[in-house]
């Protein structure tokens, strides 16, 4: 595996633009792809605004903002977006057929060392990989919303994902200043299943008269459950 320098993010929606911001801030030459030029323009504007907020909060300086924006380019041709990149992160809507179509097209265009990652929060990485000639290079990189704030990264190992790819993605995650959890491919992975368990327990408390639903909701907001779990245990709700 060559040293990773460039990243292509596929999809410029809420998650894609957040991932692109993290990637560019972390020093990677980053291409952000979407079929809609208007969405791309909006994404770049939002990323720049988020970086300005970071400056106001003294999280970064003007030079770091300028460098991040200089590393970020937009592309509305998928084949061009992935040419000679080291890592592809797909962040399109959660439809298996769409993801398989994209991975099939991308796998035919990228170099043999390129890692193909999906930001899916629940779809099978092994099933996504099945439509490619290189399932050993397909992995899950599940970022959490908003990606530039929530540092958790759930790395999902497919049935055929190589350990070298897992190790490389771990290192990428560290370079992106993420808090890492590595899981095997299973329905919902770890984060979504834990989120469901938390939600079910809240329902039981209401059913058993332990708390009223307003109280459960209020406590969840007060203690910021979705982020407290992430900070304390390395897990989070998405």
Language model regions located:
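Rossmann-fold NAD(P)-binding glycine/threonine-rich loop
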Residues: 101-152, 157-166, 170
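NAD(P)+-binding Rossmann beta1-loop-alpha1 motif at the extreme N-terminus of oxidoreductases
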Residues: 1-53, 57, 109
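Rossmann-like NAD(P)-binding element
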Residues: 35, 39-42, 55-116, 122-124
């Amino acid at each position: 595996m060559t040293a990773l320098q460039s990243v292509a993010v596929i999809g410029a929606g809420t998650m894609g633009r957040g991932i692109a911001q993290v990637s560019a801030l972390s020093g990677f030459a980053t291409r952000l792809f979407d079929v809609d030029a208007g969405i791309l323009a909006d994404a770049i504007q939002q990323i720049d605004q988020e970086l300005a907020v970071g400056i106001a909060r003294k999280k970064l300086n003007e030079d770091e903002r300028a460098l991040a924006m200089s590393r970020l380019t937009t592309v509305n041709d998928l084949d061009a977006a992935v040419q000679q990149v080291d890592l592809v992160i797909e962040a399109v809507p959660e439809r298996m057929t769409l993801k398989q179509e994209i991975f099939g097209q991308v796998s035919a265009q990228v170099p043999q060392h390129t890692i193909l990652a999906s930001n899916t929060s629940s779809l099978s990485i092994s099933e996504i990989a099945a439509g490619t000639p290189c399932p050993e290079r397909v992995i899950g990189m599940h970022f959490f919303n908003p990606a530039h704030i929530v540092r958790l990264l759930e790395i999902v190992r497919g049935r055929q994902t190589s350990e070298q790819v897992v190790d490389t993605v771990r290192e990428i995650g560290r370079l992106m200043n993420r808090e890492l959890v590595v899981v095997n491919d299973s329905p919902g992975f770890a984060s979504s299943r834990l989120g469901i368990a938390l939600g079910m327990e809240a329902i039981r408390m209401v059913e058993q008269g332990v708390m009223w639903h307003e109280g459960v909701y209020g406590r969840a907001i007060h203690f910021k459950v979705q982020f407290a779990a992430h900070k304390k245990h390395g897990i989070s709700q998405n």
